[in-house]
Amino acid sequence: MLALNINPVQQRAAERGSRTPEKVFKNVALAWHKSNRKWSQNTADRLLASLNNHIFPVIGNLPVSELKPRHFIDLQKGIEEKGLLEVASRTRQHLSNIIRHAVHQELIDTNPAANLGGVTTPPVRRHYPALPLERLPELLERIGAYHQGRELTRHAVLLMLHVFIRSSELRFARWSEIDFTNRVWTIPATREPIIGVHYSGRGAKMRMPHIVPLSEQSIAILKQIKDITGNNELIFPGDHNPYKPMCENTVNKALRVMGYDTKKDICGHGFRAMACSALMESGLWAKDAVERQMSHQERNTVRMAYIHKAEHLEARKAMMQWWSDYLEACRESYAPPYTIGKNKFIP
């Protein structure tokens, strides 16, 4: 630069003065956020809040061209020091995606946030307690004897056990999702949000419609519920306002009344683990069919596009009936899963 009679200090000052707002990290991040149209509104809002709370205060005003791995490492370490391990982990993903967006927009040539794995301690995987299957008779007895709250609450707990869907999938359910004729519950990818109720637009966890075949027992429970709430849009309306859903802690609160510690013994989400365990131990069902019914995330992105279709549906219909029959068989005394229903379900 000196050979060209250019003052390096003045040149750097001129370059700083010519920075366009579009190249500042915050604006690049907001453009990336705006470009993602597949997110639900809840996801978009939550992510934007995370950007505003944890990322923008640290590097928001820096040009993306000046960002180095050290900026991202220090940012993540700062979040980790606050004890926010899950936030730190998600921040790493967001940073990499945002800087990749900058590369795609030809603002920079490489992604300095691409290889940040291992910088922070991984978050501890959340453990949802579940009873051993040997305690099913006790659980069923306690559910049947539950009369301390609304009858609707007892039905909610029992139905959740039979269909083993996620809490929000149950709590925000509408009667329009139930097909009594074909005995199918189709949980949509998203739902019409309820004004004033956080996350009420949530549908199926994987953001694709999830098919839940309904056993004879599940249909019977739903008909009992329909006698109570059939005139409402929501299957499980709240106690005080029929236009809003039951409280998110309703099922777990009922389990605590039944005498269970929902942090150590069993929680509503733990029903999923119990069902999965029994289905696999039975030896009757292919692992892939069980995974489809559990609505677990598909790691193969090509196959993910087909999850919403009725994959393994016939097997899943039989599977859900087997699970309900298995619960009935365990009302009096425990029976190992592999001893129930082989002749009925296997040709």
Q: What are the residue ranges of the model-derived segments?
A:
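Short, charged hinge/linker segments at domain and secondary-structure junctions
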Residues: 2-12, 66-69, 100-123, 188, ...
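Basic/aromatic-enriched alpha-helical hairpins
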Residues: 6-10, 15-82, 98-101, 119-120, ...
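DNA breakage-rejoining catalytic core of tyrosine-based enzymes
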Residues: 19-23, 62-66, 108-110, 122-141, ...
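Basic, Lys/Arg- and aromatic-enriched nucleic-acid-binding interface segment
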Residues: 81-94, 104-173, 181, 191, ...
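Short, polar N-cap/turn motifs at the start of nucleic acid-interacting alpha helices
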Residues: 110, 177-184, 265, 284-306, ...
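Conserved tyrosine-mediated DNA breakage-rejoining catalytic core shared by Y-recombinases
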Residues: 114-118, 129, 172-224, 298
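Catalytic-site neighborhood detector that most strongly recognizes the C-terminal catalytic loop/helix
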Residues: 122, 130, 187-194, 219, ...
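Short, basic (Lys/Arg/His-rich) helix/loop patches that form interaction surfaces
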Residues: 141-153, 212, 224-243, 249-292, ...
